[in-house]
């Protein structure tokens, strides 16, 4: 085999591996119901939310005291400010969200990376929110206060398990 054939073969294998990685990480998780709530009053939803628990992922690894603040903008979008403490330093990420045709769903963009923000459960008084991504690997439990009533939190856990979520790796966030 000559060098050109070997390089072509390596590029083809690399391309197939990349395609496999993309399709498996972005595909909906089997058996997970991430359907959204029927309606959201976005005026009530804006404001500050404390992160109570989350599935682990790279962009929040090692973060504590995490809080998200949503602010309505005149153009109809929502400004997103996520902040927390990592290695003793205050970190802030800013993004923009817009509603979609699906009730209870936002498309949130940080830098150039868009993602689905599916509000799967919302407290009747907007005191807590359960948010998932496009697959079962993203999950957040948010509350208006740094702590959530244990009975409420246990009820959320039960309903998430009924939706097919594996909570064995769920992280409680230090506030």
Task: Go through each PLM region and give its residues.
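A beta-rich soluble binding module of mature secreted/lumenal proteins
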Residues: 2-175
């Amino acid at each position: 085999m000559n060098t050109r054939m070997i390089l072509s073969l390596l590029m083809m294998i690399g391309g197939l591996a990349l395609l496999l990685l993309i399709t498996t990480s972005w595909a909906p998780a089997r058996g997970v119901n991430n359907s959204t709530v029927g309606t959201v009053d976005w005026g009530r939803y804006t404001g500050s939310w404390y992160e109570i628990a989350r599935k682990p992922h790279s962009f929040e690894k090692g973060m504590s005291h995490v809080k998200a603040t949503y602010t309505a903008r005149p153009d109809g979008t929502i400004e997103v400010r996520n902040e927390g403490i990592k290695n003793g330093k205050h970190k802030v990420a800013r993004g923009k969200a817009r509603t979609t045709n699906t009730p209870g769903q936002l498309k949130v963009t940080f830098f150039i990376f868009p993602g689905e923000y599916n509000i799967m459960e919302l407290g009747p008084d907007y005191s807590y929110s359960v948010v998932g991504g496009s697959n079962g690997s993203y999950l957040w439990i948010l509350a208006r206060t740094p702590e959530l009533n244990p009975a409420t939190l246990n009820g959320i856990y039960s309903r998430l398990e009924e939706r097919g979520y594996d909570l064995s790796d769920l992280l409680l966030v230090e506030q």
